[in-house]
């Protein structure tokens, strides 16, 4: 198979939440295959995009299209973390409503291409609470808020909805990562790692490959799909 199929040279890729845990790795990965990457976030990026504000999304999208002419791939990466957040409304607003807002507004301006959503294994399965016993991160108890699980399950449903709505011109898919190592407490990392078939948490750069696949012509017949990237955690009981 020709490497050219995986080539995203001069494709315009919009990434939300680009300064978060995984965002910088996604930016790096897409730049490595020749894409024009537009990294956005609520601060510290050239183009500011707040996924909870439709006005912000419209303003940012118009700037991008004026500069580059089009958007080929949208990556809905912005999210409220599930480490210890407890605010139901804010988590839903960012993770679920934010994904909806961007998919609706930016998708309507895309002529063709790919939308890739980012969910979580907690959108598929319930938490194993034993992992979080006596686990603290930045001085706060770790856990999985109900809003986080509900929002990520909703993202999976939205993926199928927009895949149906935008077919056949725009493909819409979802990646479903498991735990990403981010200097969590050693006790948590050890317990979590024993739950996976690969015996470890994911590195920050190990989700980006699936995004490249879903943005490229290698996945030209893939839409409405969820790619689970969890080291086999959800594949066994």
Predicted regions: what they are:
Residues 5-37:
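Canonical Rossmann dinucleotide-binding motif of NAD(H)/NADP(H)-dependent dehydrogenases/reductases
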Residues 62, 94-113, 119-126, 160-168, ...:
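Amphipathic alpha-helical dimer-interface segment in Rossmann-like NAD(P)H-dependent oxidoreductases
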Residues 167-171, 222-224:
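Short, small/polar-rich loop/turn modules that mediate ligand/substrate recognition or access, typified
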Residues 80-84, 116-167, 180:
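Catalytic loop of short-chain dehydrogenase/reductase
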Residues 86-101, 116, 148-151, 155, ...:
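Catalytic Tyr-X3-Lys loop
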Residues 77-82, 232:
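Conserved NAD(P)H cofactor-binding loop of Rossmann-fold oxidoreductase domains
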Residues 2-4, 130, 134-135, 212, ...:
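Short C-terminal tail/terminal secondary-structure segment
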Residues 196-207, 218:
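A conserved structural motif in NAD(P)-dependent oxidoreductases
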